[in-house]
Amino acid sequence: MDQCGTVERELEKVLHKFGGYGQHCERSLEELMEYAGGLRREILQAAEQDGELSGTLSLVLTQCCKRIKDTVQKLASDHKDIHSSVSRVGKAIDKNFDADISSVGIDGCWQNDSQQILSEVMVEHFFRQGMLDVAEELCQEAGLSIDASQKEPFVELNRILEALKVRVLRPALEWAVSNREMLMAQNSSLEFKLHRLYFISLLMGGTVNQREALQYAKNFQPFAENHQKDIQVLMGSLVYLRQGIENSPYVHLLDANQWADICDIFTRDACALLGLSVESPLSVSFSAGCVALPALINIKAVIEQRQCTGVWNQKDELPIEVDLGKKCWYHSIFACPILRQQTTDNNPPMKLVCGHIISRDALNKMFNGSKLKCPYCPMEQSPGDAKQIFF
């Protein structure tokens, strides 16, 4: 993050210079045009009177040409100075970021099945972004066969999201009503918040929409139990329709941020109904990589300097723990207390009859014949009675 801050500071300097140069350039050119325009009018007047330029006017014309030349040279010089500032941004990027990241890669990681999985993840990401043409082109180039049923939900969701971004609620309301039972099963407040926004949009129309707003308030009835206070606030705002909601204690109802919030809520709840994560796997992987890559490059350099290349064999493990933040916590992680190793798909956690948990590798190493003694209590049991645990 320090490297990003350094580059950002250089970039801010350049942008500041761009803004200042643009204003100075525009101001200088306007002054020149005004000065040259005035001189032109004087020349035309002199031509109408005697047809010849006076000595004074000729001198002024010479000075005007010199002023134009000096101004252009000054602007060109300032422009060169900006170029040097731009080059400093490039140097800051080269200095603070490692252009070669191949040292932390795994040979052959994108071959065969892995390449196909990556292509499928990219296709799903493009579907989520509404870039259907790009996704279909990638399917053809990668030789993927994507069923139309996989694409249709994303088409509908993107259509609704685009409507919400321009503050059109009808498509989202229709979707929420048709999926009401499933939304209520997951305790979603999406439909209520959509009705709330529509009601607020009616309030913004003033007294003209008062009757329609009262009629529309009937849609709040199914949500009265869980959103009673919010509904009371909405109904109380009707008292101030005549003077305008923006001039009332209910002005917070007009907060523009709630439109961005409703887009996030819709995306989250719609993805939950489809059994999808809110963010695409590609976005999550990219974000995690941006956090982990600097740490891995640094530890790789230390390992090479100390000639300890055997410490990191790059086989589905890292030499250090990389904290990706709570945003990337998707499930619990179990470390076997016997072997002091983190469990994996090939070495999952196993629950013994007594309730204690160890890894499968530890289980295989500890049983003697047909019996296994728990390392934490005196209970003896059969290894076959152990059950795999899923976090």
Curated annotation (Swiss-Prot):
<keyword id="KW-0963">Cytoplasm</keyword>
<dbReference type="GO" id="GO:0005737">
    <property type="term" value="C:cytoplasm"/>
</dbReference>
<dbReference type="GO" id="GO:0005654">
    <property type="term" value="C:nucleoplasm"/>
</dbReference>
<dbReference type="InterPro" id="IPR006594">
    <property type="entry name" value="LisH"/>
</dbReference>
<dbReference type="InterPro" id="IPR027370">
    <property type="entry name" value="Znf-RING_euk"/>
</dbReference>
<dbReference type="InterPro" id="IPR037680">
    <property type="entry name" value="RMD5A_dRING"/>
</dbReference>
<dbReference type="InterPro" id="IPR024964">
    <property type="entry name" value="CTLH/CRA"/>
</dbReference>
<dbReference type="InterPro" id="IPR045098">
    <property type="entry name" value="Fyv10_fam"/>
</dbReference>
<keyword id="KW-0833">Ubl conjugation pathway</keyword>
<keyword id="KW-0863">Zinc-finger</keyword>
<keyword id="KW-0479">Metal-binding</keyword>
<dbReference type="GO" id="GO:0005634">
    <property type="term" value="C:nucleus"/>
</dbReference>
<keyword id="KW-0862">Zinc</keyword>
<dbReference type="InterPro" id="IPR044063">
    <property type="entry name" value="ZF_RING_GID"/>
</dbReference>
<protein>
    <recommendedName>
        <fullName>E3 ubiquitin-protein ligase RMND5A</fullName>
        <ecNumber>2.3.2.27</ecNumber>
    </recommendedName>
</protein>
<comment type="function">
    <text>E3 ubiquitin-protein ligase component of the CTLH complex.</text>
</comment>
<feature type="zinc finger region" description="RING-Gid-type">
    <location>
        <begin position="336"/>
        <end position="377"/>
    </location>
</feature>
<dbReference type="GO" id="GO:0061630">
    <property type="term" value="F:ubiquitin protein ligase activity"/>
</dbReference>
<dbReference type="GO" id="GO:0043161">
    <property type="term" value="P:proteasome-mediated ubiquitin-dependent protein catabolic process"/>
</dbReference>
<comment type="subunit">
    <text>Identified in the CTLH complex that contains at least RANBP9, MKLN1, MAEA, RMND5A, GID8 and ARMC8.</text>
</comment>
<dbReference type="InterPro" id="IPR013144">
    <property type="entry name" value="CRA_dom"/>
</dbReference>
<dbReference type="InterPro" id="IPR006595">
    <property type="entry name" value="CTLH_C"/>
</dbReference>
<keyword id="KW-0539">Nucleus</keyword>
<feature type="domain" description="LisH">
    <location>
        <begin position="114"/>
        <end position="146"/>
    </location>
</feature>
<dbReference type="Pfam" id="PF10607">
    <property type="entry name" value="CTLH"/>
</dbReference>
<dbReference type="Pfam" id="PF13445">
    <property type="entry name" value="zf-RING_UBOX"/>
</dbReference>
<dbReference type="GO" id="GO:0004842">
    <property type="term" value="F:ubiquitin-protein transferase activity"/>
</dbReference>
<dbReference type="GO" id="GO:0000151">
    <property type="term" value="C:ubiquitin ligase complex"/>
</dbReference>
<dbReference type="GO" id="GO:0008270">
    <property type="term" value="F:zinc ion binding"/>
</dbReference>
<feature type="domain" description="CTLH">
    <location>
        <begin position="153"/>
        <end position="210"/>
    </location>
</feature>
<dbReference type="GO" id="GO:0000209">
    <property type="term" value="P:protein polyubiquitination"/>
</dbReference>
<keyword id="KW-0808">Transferase</keyword>
